[in-house]
From Swiss-Prot:
Plays a critical role in cytoplasmic virus egress. Participates in the final step of tegumentation and envelope acquisition within the host cytoplasm. The keyword rRNA processing does not apply. It is found in: Virion; Virion tegument; Host cytoplasm; Host Golgi apparatus. Interacts with BSRF1 tegument protein; the BBRF2-BSRF1 complexes oligomerize and might play a role in tethering the viral nucleocapsids to the host Golgi membrane during secondary envelopment. Pfam families: Herpes_UL7. Belongs to the herpesviridae cytoplasmic envelopment protein 1 family. The keyword DNA repair does not apply. This is Cytoplasmic envelopment protein 1.
Amino acid sequence: MASGKHHQPGGTRSLTMQKVSLRVTPRLVLEVNRHNAICVATNVPEFYNARGDLNVRDLRAHVKARMISSQFCGYILVSLLDSEDQVDHLNIFPHVFSERMILYKPNNVNLMEMCALLSMIENAKSPSIGLCREVLGRLTLLHSKCNNLDSLFLYNGARTLLSTLVKYHDLEEGAATPGPWNEGLSLFKLHKELKRAPSEARDLMQSLFLTSGKMGCLARSPKDYCADLNKEEDANSGFTFNLFYQDSLLTKHFQCQTVLQTLRRKCLGSDTVSKIIP
């Protein structure tokens, strides 16, 4: 499995590759840092300019600084099936969601950078086709340097998220040469089409395919909800938890109360793992 070593071609390797290639995507990726009694989960800074040019040098320096920081705990992420990600809602039970969320701290700088790029993708408020292409190119290079199951999982997931942004925002409309995108997250395509539909049909279809009550209520203000959780639970945990992210197409799930509860619990109490796929 994911030993971090290069795998030789063969039946076992092919079967494992097929398993990794299932429609499972790493989502809600944030950096987690702890200092004294403060725990912070935050998006990775925007290491790109208005044209979408990726600042690889500063991004790499940021990742290396995290690797040697005693305050850095890892990247929090959750693995979601394509059918579970409904844009504004999650079609998954809380106990399953909790089991899927991990605090990931790889020993490889390239895997660290792939996580950082995933966080940047999800938090991009106004993504451009130039940025999507640059990020995919960088991910391709990083994956080629690792060539293990974790890098494959992160690469496939990031490519799916980039493809989702490109398709949802029509970023490649009129392009002479289409990029190497896949279909993206399927329910985001439905969400996009329903925005154009008559209101009666839209409401019915959204209730059938894009709404789930499994994860409970949404928070009016994620920041205020986290503050309330701190008041209730600080006496037990000894930590104050803070969340920072950009409100974007791919970060709507941070408005879910159960997501915030699980995120806080995992960031404060989870042991880190060095492999996503053991």
